Structure formats: C-alpha cells, structure tokens
From Swiss-Prot:
Gene3D superfamilies: Aspartate Aminotransferase, domain 1 (3.90.1150.10), Type I PLP-dependent aspartate aminotransferase-like (Major domain) (3.40.640.10). Its EC number is 2.6.1.52. It comes from Edwardsiella ictaluri (strain 93-146). Pathway: Amino-acid biosynthesis; L-serine biosynthesis; L-serine from 3-phospho-D-glycerate: step 2/3; Cofactor biosynthesis; pyridoxine 5'-phosphate biosynthesis; pyridoxine 5'-phosphate from D-erythrose 4-phosphate: step 3/5. It is found in: Cytoplasm. Keywords: Amino-acid biosynthesis, Aminotransferase, Cytoplasm, Pyridoxal phosphate, Pyridoxine biosynthesis, Serine biosynthesis, Transferase. The modification N6-(pyridoxal phosphate)lysine is found at K199. GO terms for cellular component: cytoplasm. This is Phosphoserine aminotransferase. Homodimer. GO terms for biological process: L-serine biosynthetic process; pyridoxine biosynthetic process.
C-alpha cells in the first residue's frame, strides 16, 4: 500500500505507533477480554488511565501544582462560551479583552458577545504586503478587564504568535488548540489554557483545559453544569460519562511524546519540518506564502500558486501520490499543509519533492 501522509488541519494525523498499539489492544485491553471503550469510566482500570494521562500531560508541560487539568466535552467552541461564563462572574457589565488575529480568535470574541461586551483588539496588520501580528506591547488593552483572550496559532491564515504574554497580574486565556505540545510554554504566564484534541493531542471528542485554582468558583449562577470548571474539578472531569476512547488515545499520545523526548524535541522537529517547507515555497516564483517570516506558523503552512486555476489539479495529483488533505480552507483557498507533531519529516520531504515536480511540469 502507498504510504499516505495526512496534512489535514484536524482531525489530524496520529502517531503510527499509537495507532498500532490501539489496534493490538482494541478487543482485549489489558487482558480484560474487552475493549477500553466498553469498560466503566468509574472503574479502577479506567481511573488509572485518566490519572496517568493527567500526570503525563503535567510532566510534559511542567504544569505548576496550583493548576488543575480537565478533560472536557464540547471542543474549543464549547470553551468559547465556557471561558466568559466561568471568568466574568455575575456582573454582566464586566469586560474582557479579545486580541483578534484571525478566524478563531474572532469566533471566540463573537461567542463572548452572548455573555458580555468583549473589547475586540485587531492585532493583525499588513507590512510590505505580508500578514503579521502586532507585538503584545502594542495591544490596546482596557485598563480593567476580567481577562485577555488570544489564539497563539491561527490555522487558516497560518500565523503564529511565539511571544509569551507578560501582562503582570492580568488573567491571560489562550486557545492553544493547534499549537499545544508543539513547543515548550511557561504555563505560569497563563490563567487558563484550552485546546481541542484533534490536532496535537488525539482524536476529536475531548478538550483539554488547564486552569489556575484561584480562577475556580467564579462562574455565573446560570452556567450549564457541564461547562462549570468547579463542577468538573470536583467530579474529576466525570460529571457525566466522558469520551473514554478519546481520553485513552490522548493518554497514549502523551506517553509517545515522552518517549520521543518531550516538547523540546517536538519543537526541534517541527522547526526542521517548517523550515524545509518554507524553503521550498520561497525558493522560486511558482509558490508563495503571504505571512511575514516572524509570524509564520510551524503547524499550518498555507501557500498559493502563481496560477490558481492549477489548484484542483494539484490537490488531485497530490492525493494520488499519497499526500492527502492539502486543499486550503474555503476562506483562504489555495493549499495548506498542516504538519503537527505526528507528521514525520519524511512526509514533508515527500510533499516538497512533489511540489518541485509539479512546478517543473506546470511552471
């Protein structure tokens, strides 16, 4: 069978070692004669899975002791609502800053309008025709706000903010759905981090939340219990039946990451993959990327061709070559290669070779 590399923005490629182990264990997990999908989430066996997953994630990100880790439902969009409902309290006139650099940050700000009057800050700018993000020192924040929300990596436009926040006592909330575990971060600089699993963590269906303990217990009275961080903490993320298989697979990914050398090693690999792909894009006139180098994403690399009429042919030929899901988002068009942790260097090398051949034949 032809080697297939999945460049989808999410659900994304999973480590092949994890998939093979899951295949081996699928019908007889730990000698129990049943699948992990069929056991009680409150039984001793699965509680051990949950405990190990939490500890492994804590180890990988060096999560401080005064932060709680939750495994939730609802994806990042669920957190778009959960964040204001948990952090704004009962005062409906409370304000929150939303730094908007792309589609997902804008979506979070739009959802927040249901619960407050968010202060949206446009941090995107064009410099010499290239999309870039304003430095954090230039963000026009309110003097008093309940929190600052931003998205460090925007998957559609392929922009990243590597600068870590330094806003004193201000509560910083980050949507790290597409960048978590791809590089080291200082968790103590954030009040709350959330991430949908389907890019760098595991399969779709589970969402990570890392929340500082002093932010618990602030939720509005009318918040749905399933979104209340305090309720989830008190129930060990099992207020209702959790997505156990996604939790189990995410835990396996955490163990795989530790075996590979942790997030520092992932950062090294991801930089190497991104450098190779951007060099291929910048190396001629056939392809282009419209993001300023300082803000180019290492996770999601969009690019266009000199003649957009060739796009469908590129997608089709790439798929036949085992390079799947390279069609750009409908908002941006063109091509997009998502190269998360599980994408091996060989996958990017195969893509770069295909791009060179395609340009030679159609340039």
């Amino acid at each position: 069978m032809t080697q297939v590399y999945n460049f989808c923005a999410g659900p994304a490629m999973l480590p092949v070692e994890v998939l093979r182990r899951a295949e081996q264990e699928l019908c007889n997990w730990h000698g129990l004669g049943t699948s992990v999908m069929e056991i009680s989430h409150r039984g001793e066996a699965f509680m051990q899975v949950a405990a190990e997953a939490e500890q492994d994630l804590r180890d990988l990100l060096k999560v401080p002791a005064d932060y709680r880790i939750l495994f939730c439902h609802g994806g990042a969009r669920g957190q778009f609502a959960a964040v204001p409902l948990n952090l704004l309290g009962s005062e409906r006139t409370a304000r929150a800053d939303y730094a908007v650099g792309g589609y997902w940050a804008q979506s979070a700000a739009k959802e927040a309008q249901r619960y407050c009057n968010p202060h949206a800050i446009d941090i995107a700018q064009r410099v010499d025709g290239k999309l870039s993000m304003k430095p954090m020192a230039q963000w026009d924040l309110l003097e008093e706000s309940a929190y600052l929300h931003y998205c460090p990596n925007e998957t559609i436009d392929g922009v990243t903010i590597d600068e870590e926040p330094d806003f004193g006592d201000r509560v910083v909330v980050a949507d790290m759905s597409s960048t978590i575990l791809s590089r080291p971060i200082d968790v103590s600089r954030y009040g709350l981090i959330y991430a949908g699993a389907q890019k760098n963590v595991g399969p779709a269906g589970i969402t990570l939340v890392i929340v500082r303990e002093d932010l618990l217990g602030r939720a509005r009275r009318e918040i749905p219990s399933i979104l209340d961080y305090q309720v989830l903490v008190e129930s060990d993320s099992m207020f209702n039946t959790p997505p156990t298989f996604a939790w189990y697979l995410s835990g396996m990914v955490f163990k795989w990451l530790k075996e590979q050398g942790g997030v520092s090693e992932m950062a090294r690999r991801n930089q190497a993959k991104a450098d190779l792909l951007y060099q291929a894009i910048d190396g001629g006139e056939f392809y282009r990327n419209d993001v300023a180098p300082a803000n180019r994403s290492r996770m999601n690399v969009p690019f266009q061709m000199v003649d957009s009429a060739l796009d469908p042919l590129f997608w089709d030929e790439a798929r036949k070559a085992g390079l799947h899901a390279l069609k750009g988002h409908k908002v941006a068009g063109g091509m997009r290669a998502s190269i998360y942790n599980a994408m091996p260097l060989a996958g990017v090398q195969a893509l770069v070779a295909f791009m060179a051949d395609f340009a030679r034949r159609h340039g």
